């Protein structure tokens, strides 16, 4: 991209540095970009050049659902990005466009339907009760992240994936190394290769499986020649890693509820509003730093009067879309009565997060178990003293010290 490829009226390129924001603070750079206009230009700490940034709710939905913007073309580019290393596997579902993307997602769709998610509800509730039991037996103080918020999502996603309980620790370790930007490219790539090898073996053993877990569904699809083993492994890795996002989201959720006890007390006294309240918290929580994966414009497209040329890189900000005042009145306020609430915390369009329904289930189970079974729960330190992750792409508390 060069200045000559675009018109004179384009916004200036804004540097967006990598910073570790305190708590659940909204990124001030993103706030400024939202004020500058619906379509701006950014340069992130890594990669090359600049990219467009789209922040309004309707435009974010347009870009993510429009075949004129593709992911596959990103593979051969060093698009400006937050992550210091870029190690996607060619053919991975996150970098495929329809129809290949649709074919691959179809292979595991059954596991993420309402029926598929309900299949693990009671087992998930049982595993969560065991974790809360253990925390209560040990007595206060406790680290809610270590005791509950970290092991629970790992157990649930491993259950859904068909990963044996004995391998959960390895999965968690690999995921943390892949998601962190502080260990360097070699460490992240080695962790990803080890997870790839693990799923290659596991899926390969299940080519004749009739099981309902994800690796069985993938193994059966490979056995029917609907997808390749490489495609199956790439999808399994993405789903496994994504499953742990609940740890960070729920960590921010409980940090917020315990920092503002009136919110937690309302959820205790009005349990019927919990599903709606969780949706509002999912909208409000800034779950990541900066932006995620880019897209490439496959032809010239005009958005809000700005011409995006074929070949230009484009990012959307789901965080910004969730604070669009045209869609969410008083967007910075947490409003448990907000309805409708068309947030895009799980994305939109063909790349919508397949685990969105599972994440909602886990969040509801966590709120029920923690608030109902530990009524005196409170932070053991001041809210501003809760340590948050540093050098990470996904935001969340490193630990959540609590007492009761």
Swiss-Prot record:
Keywords: Heme, Iron, Metal-binding, Monooxygenase, Oxidoreductase. This is Biflaviolin synthase CYP158A2. Heme binds at residue 353. The record marks 87 as: Involved in determining product regiospecificity. It catalyses: 2 flaviolin + 2 reduced [2Fe-2S]-[ferredoxin] + O2 + H(+) = 3,3'-biflaviolin + 2 oxidized [2Fe-2S]-[ferredoxin] + 2 H2O; 2 flaviolin + 2 reduced [2Fe-2S]-[ferredoxin] + O2 + H(+) = 3,8'-biflaviolin + 2 oxidized [2Fe-2S]-[ferredoxin] + 2 H2O. Flaviolin 1 binds at residues 288, 293. PROSITE patterns: CYTOCHROME_P450. Belongs to the cytochrome P450 family. It holds the Pfam family p450. Its cofactor is heme. It comes from the Bacteria. One of its GO terms (biological process) is pigment metabolic process. InterPro entries: Cyt_P450, Cyt_P450_B, Cyt_P450_CS, Cyt_P450_sf. Pathway: Pigment biosynthesis. Its EC number is 1.14.19.69. The structural studies suggest catalysis likely occurs through proton relay via a 'proton wire' formed by water molecules in the active site. Flaviolin 2 binds at residue 288.
């Amino acid at each position: 991209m060069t200045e000559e490829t675009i018109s004179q009226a384009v916004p200036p390129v804004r540097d967006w540095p990598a910073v570790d924001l305190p708590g659940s603070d909204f990124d001030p750079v993103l706030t400024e970009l939202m004020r500058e206009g619906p379509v701006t230009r950014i340069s992130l700490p890594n990669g090359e050049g600049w990219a467009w940034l789209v922040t309004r709710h309707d435009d974010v939905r347009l870009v993510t659902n429009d075949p004129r913007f593709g992911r596959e073309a990103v593979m051969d580019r060093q698009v400006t990005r937050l992550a210091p290393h870029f190690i996607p596997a060619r053919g991975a579902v996150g970098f495929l466009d329809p129809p290949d993307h649709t074919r691959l997602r179809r292979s595991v769709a059954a596991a993420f339907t309402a029926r598929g998610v309900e299949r693990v509800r009671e087992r998930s509730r049982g595993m969560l009760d065991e974790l809360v039991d253990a925390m209560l037996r040990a007595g206060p103080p406790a680290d809610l992240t270590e005791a509950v918020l970290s092991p629970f999502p790992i157990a649930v996603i491993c259950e859904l994936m068909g990963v044996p309980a004995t391998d959960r620790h390895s999965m968690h370790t690999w995921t943390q190394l892949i998601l962190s930007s502080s260990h360097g490219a070699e460490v992240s790539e080695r962790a990803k290769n080890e997870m790839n090898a693990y799923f290659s073996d596991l899926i390969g053993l299940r080519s004749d499986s009739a099981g309902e877990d994800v690796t069985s569904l993938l193994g059966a699809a490979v056995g029917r020649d609907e997808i390749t083993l490489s495609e199956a492994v790439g999808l399994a890795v993405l789903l496994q890693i994504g499953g742990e996002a609940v740890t960070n989201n729920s960590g921010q959720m409980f940090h917020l509820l315990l920092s503002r006890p009136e919110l937690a007390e309302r959820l205790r006294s009005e349990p019927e509003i919990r599903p709606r309240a969780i949706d509002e918290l999912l909208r409000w929580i800034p779950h990541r730093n900066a932006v995620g994966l880019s897209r490439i414009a496959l032809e010239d497209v005009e958005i809000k009067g700005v011409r995006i040329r074929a070949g230009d890189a484009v990012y959307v900000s789901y965080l910004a879309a969730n604070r669009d005042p045209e869609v969410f009145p008083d967007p910075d306020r947490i409003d448990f009565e907000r309805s409708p609430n068309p947030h895009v915390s799980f994305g939109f369009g063909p790349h919508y997060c397949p685990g969105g329904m599972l994440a909602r289930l886990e969040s509801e189970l966590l709120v029920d178990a923690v608030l109902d079974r530990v009524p005196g729960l409170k932070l053991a330190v001041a809210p501003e003293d809760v340590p948050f992750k540093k050098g990470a792409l996904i935001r969340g508390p490193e630990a959540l010290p609590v007492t009761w």
